[in-house]
């Protein structure tokens, strides 16, 4: 009898979590787009602009071209993203951090908090080296993500990602938190695919397409031929 009760309890809990998982993964309930979406910053980035509280935004910088694209995106939408905002800046190399620090000086009203993330995988790394760095990144990023996510509670917030594989780990932890702590609500993860990806998505894009709340591409061909659930607003960076 006790075994039957335990089995029933496990079944109920498992079913509840499966339903919750379906609810938090937008892929299951987002329709494919067929036309160009309206280039409206509020709709594009899923921000409740009417809120009186300052926006809390997490931005992750990759390196090189990814950093350049993210900075241009922030600059193009500065009125929406950088107006009296609190910016949580994740980075994996010092050059990107310095570049962002120089850029953000123009917006003295923004508060910035910096978080260094290990790279999920180094270029030309062996399989063993990749496994080692991925495990280290998982542990370190978990601490950062939990701290940042709880700091955002009660305020309009956004996780804006672009580029490297570390974005997958960050998104993974955010969705785990949504699954286990439903009262936290949505993390509002937006991934912007690189301008360089015209016909096929990046490896990071292929993974995050199934996970993030909003997946944005910058070329119609990519949306129409490969990623029908994505949004296309034209060139953003």
UniProtKB/Swiss-Prot annotation:
<feature type="topological domain" description="Cytoplasmic">
    <location>
        <begin position="29"/>
        <end position="237"/>
    </location>
</feature>
<dbReference type="Pfam" id="PF08660">
    <property type="entry name" value="Alg14"/>
</dbReference>
<dbReference type="GO" id="GO:0031965">
    <property type="term" value="C:nuclear membrane"/>
</dbReference>
<dbReference type="GO" id="GO:0043541">
    <property type="term" value="C:UDP-N-acetylglucosamine transferase complex"/>
</dbReference>
<dbReference type="GO" id="GO:0098548">
    <property type="term" value="C:cytoplasmic side of Golgi membrane"/>
</dbReference>
<dbReference type="GO" id="GO:0005777">
    <property type="term" value="C:peroxisome"/>
</dbReference>
<dbReference type="InterPro" id="IPR013969">
    <property type="entry name" value="Oligosacch_biosynth_Alg14"/>
</dbReference>
<keyword id="KW-0472">Membrane</keyword>
<comment type="similarity">
    <text>Belongs to the ALG14 family.</text>
</comment>
<dbReference type="GO" id="GO:0042175">
    <property type="term" value="C:nuclear outer membrane-endoplasmic reticulum membrane network"/>
</dbReference>
<dbReference type="GO" id="GO:0043495">
    <property type="term" value="F:protein-membrane adaptor activity"/>
</dbReference>
<protein>
    <recommendedName>
        <fullName>UDP-N-acetylglucosamine transferase subunit ALG14</fullName>
    </recommendedName>
</protein>
<dbReference type="GO" id="GO:0005811">
    <property type="term" value="C:lipid droplet"/>
</dbReference>
<keyword id="KW-0539">Nucleus</keyword>
<feature type="transmembrane region" description="Helical">
    <location>
        <begin position="8"/>
        <end position="28"/>
    </location>
</feature>
<dbReference type="GO" id="GO:0005789">
    <property type="term" value="C:endoplasmic reticulum membrane"/>
</dbReference>
<dbReference type="GO" id="GO:0006488">
    <property type="term" value="P:dolichol-linked oligosaccharide biosynthetic process"/>
</dbReference>
<feature type="topological domain" description="Lumenal">
    <location>
        <begin position="1"/>
        <end position="7"/>
    </location>
</feature>
<keyword id="KW-1133">Transmembrane helix</keyword>
<keyword id="KW-0812">Transmembrane</keyword>
<comment type="subunit">
    <text>Heterodimer with ALG13 to form a functional enzyme.</text>
</comment>
<keyword id="KW-0256">Endoplasmic reticulum</keyword>
<comment type="function">
    <text>Involved in protein N-glycosylation. Essential for the second step of the dolichol-linked oligosaccharide pathway. Anchors the catalytic subunit ALG13 to the ER.</text>
</comment>
């Amino acid at each position: 009898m006790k075994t039957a009760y335990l089995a029933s309890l496990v079944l109920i809990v498992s079913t509840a979590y499966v339903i919750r998982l379906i609810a938090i993964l937008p892929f299951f309930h987002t329709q494919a787009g067929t036309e160009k979406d309206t280039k409206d910053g509020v709709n594009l980035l899923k921000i409740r602009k009417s809120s009186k509280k300052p926006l809390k935004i997490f931005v992750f910088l990759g390196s090189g071209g990814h950093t350049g694209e993210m900075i241009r995106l922030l600059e193009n939408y500065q009125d929406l993203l950088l107006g009296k905002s609190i910016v949580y800046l994740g980075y994996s190399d010092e050059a990107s951090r310095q570049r962002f620090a120089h850029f953000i000086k123009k917006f003295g009203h923004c508060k910035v908090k910096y978080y260094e993330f290990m790279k999920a995988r180094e270029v030309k790394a062996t399989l063993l080296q990749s496994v080692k760095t991925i495990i280290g990144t998982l542990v370190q990023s978990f601490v950062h993500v939990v701290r940042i996510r709880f700091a955002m509670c009660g305020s309009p917030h956004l996780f804006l990602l672009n580029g490297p594989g570390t974005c997958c780990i960050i998104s993974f932890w955010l969705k785990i938190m949504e699954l286990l702590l439903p009262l936290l609500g949505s993390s509002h993860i937006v991934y912007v695919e690189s301008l360089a990806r015209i016909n096929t998505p990046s490896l990071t894009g292929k993974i995050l397409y199934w996970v993030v709340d909003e997946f944005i591409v910058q070329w119609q061909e990519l949306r129409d031929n490969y990623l029908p659930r994505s949004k296309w607003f034209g060139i953003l960076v």
